[in-house]
Amino acid sequence: MRRRKAPVREVLGDPIYGNKVVTKFVNKMMYDGKKSVAEKIIYATFDRIEEKTKEKGIEVFEKALERVRPMVEVRSRRVGGATYQVPVEVRATRQQSLSIRWLLEAARKRNERTMVDRLANELIDAANDRGSAFKKKEDVHKMAEANKAFAHYRW
């Protein structure tokens, strides 16, 4: 383990919207350092969303991220030989990174032809409380609800 907490590096806003969350999404989506490819996919996705829903792509994106954000999650805690799943609240930074990760995983698992289509459809679904990423959040919340009895083991 490291001695000190790692400093949080500040990300710059993306070139078109100046939005830091879009930059984080691009960084998470990028393979092999190909940021320009990831950016092209994101912006094409926003255009595709605008074609399909007649809403601004960035607004649907933010709405989807908000809907997929987990409020609570379970963490394993060993107490006297037994391992309990203890529900804990999720910090805002972790909420954001989990929602980004879940949306990308869900989009990659979809079976549309291009990543633009997959991501656009997953974002639209998430914004409308559907899709794999939203289901993942619901499952995490159900686990926390089911293990509410162990909430007093928080640390």
Curated annotation (Swiss-Prot):
| Keyword set includes DNA-binding | no
Q: Pfam families per the record?
A: Ribosomal_S7
| Stored Gene3D superfamilies | Ribosomal protein S7 domain (1.10.455.10)
Cellular component terms, GO, for this chain's entry? small ribosomal subunit
Q: Which GO terms describe its molecular function?
A: rRNA binding; structural constituent of ribosome; tRNA binding
Cystine connections: none
Question: GO biological process annotations for this chain's record?
Answer: translation
Q: Does the keyword Lipid biosynthesis apply?
A: no
Query: Sorted alphabetically, which keywords does the UniProt record give?
Result: Ribonucleoprotein, Ribosomal protein, RNA-binding, rRNA-binding, tRNA-binding
List the coiled-coil residues: none
The cross-references to SUPFAM superfamilies, in alphabetical order and at most eight, read: Ribosomal protein S7
InterPro entries in UniProt = Ribosomal_uS7, Ribosomal_uS7_bac/org-type, Ribosomal_uS7_CS, Ribosomal_uS7_dom, Ribosomal_uS7_dom_sf
Its biological purpose is as follows: One of the primary rRNA binding proteins, it binds directly to 16S rRNA where it nucleates assembly of the head domain of the 30S subunit. Is located at the subunit interface close to the decoding center, probably blocks exit of the E-site tRNA.
The record's listing under HAMAP family reads:
Ribosomal_uS7_B
Q: Which family does it belong to?
A: Belongs to the universal ribosomal protein uS7 family.
On assembly, the entry states:
Part of the 30S ribosomal subunit. Contacts proteins S9 and S11.
The record's annotation in NCBIfam families points to: rpsG_bact (TIGR01029)
This protein is called what? Small ribosomal subunit protein uS7
| Gene this chain is encoded by | rpsG
